[in-house]
Swiss-Prot record:
It comes from the Bacteria. One of its GO terms (biological process) is translation. One of its GO terms (molecular function) is structural constituent of ribosome. It comes from Histophilus somni (strain 2336) (Haemophilus somnus). The gene is rpmF. HAMAP family: Ribosomal_bL32. It holds the Pfam family Ribosomal_L32p. The keyword Cell cycle does not apply. Belongs to the bacterial ribosomal protein bL32 family. InterPro entries: Ribosomal_bL32, Ribosomal_bL32_bact, Ribosomal_zn-bd. This is Large ribosomal subunit protein bL32. Residues 1-38 are annotated as: Disordered. GO terms for cellular component: large ribosomal subunit.
Amino acid sequence: MAVQQNKKSRSRRDMRRSHDALTTAAVSVDKTSGETHLRHHVTADGYYRGRKVINK
């Protein structure tokens, strides 16, 4: 089992963890239906940028 040779300081530990923060998803509202969706993704009704791109 691996055992550290020297103790890492709180500063080094926190600097390593600085990239671990979570970000919220970029959510947009559709122009036609008012439905929320992820940016650059088609809505559940098949609309993308105000145009119908998928017919069900």
